[in-house]
Design a protein with these regions (language model features):
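Structure-specific nucleic-acid interaction/processing domains
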Residues: 1-141
Length: 141
């Protein structure tokens, strides 16, 4: 179950591309900060008599997602999903917004130096023009 503003969140809204999240291991309170898209592109075979492959946008596996961290994935296998809480920090309208807010949250929380986090890397490339509509009123919960 994902939570947003402490309420269960189950619907991928069309206006949003994805979200920035915090996954917390409940026994140790260690966390992982990441991002996940609501949508993914799927390549379909060409229509009969055509040669060009088709692209389709489908809902991603976000409901079942527990992050890209190998450590978190292993803990999930060992202890089960009930040992984790998944919180959505920001709903994002673009991939650039997701990338920017994920990196901002990771730097603000000092995830690479603070032992309370599983994050092992901060990887981000965002161009200023891609986030012009983003204002500094994004506050994490």
């Amino acid at each position: 179950m994902w939570y947003y503003n402490d309420e269960p969140y189950e619907i991928a809204l069309g206006e949003y591309q994805g979200f920035v999240y915090c996954i917390t291991e409940l026994t140790t309170n260690k966390m992982y900060i990441g991002k996940k898209g609501f949508w993914s592109k799927k390549t379909l075979p060409p229509l009969k008599g055509k040669t060009r492959k088709r692209r389709s946008v489908v809902e991603s596996d976000w409901m079942k997602y527990y992050g890209s961290s190998e450590v978190v994935k292993q803990l999930l296998l060992e202890h089960g999903a009930d040992n984790f809480r998944r919180d959505i920090l920001y709903l994002c309208k673009s991939k650039a917004e997701m990338g920017y807010l994920e990196a901002k949250e990771q730097f603000d929380r000092n995830v690479l130096l603070d032992d309370r986090y599983y994050n092992g890397i901060i990887n981000c490339k965002v161009h200023r023009n891609h986030i012009k509509g983003l204002h500094s009123n994004h506050n994490s919960i």
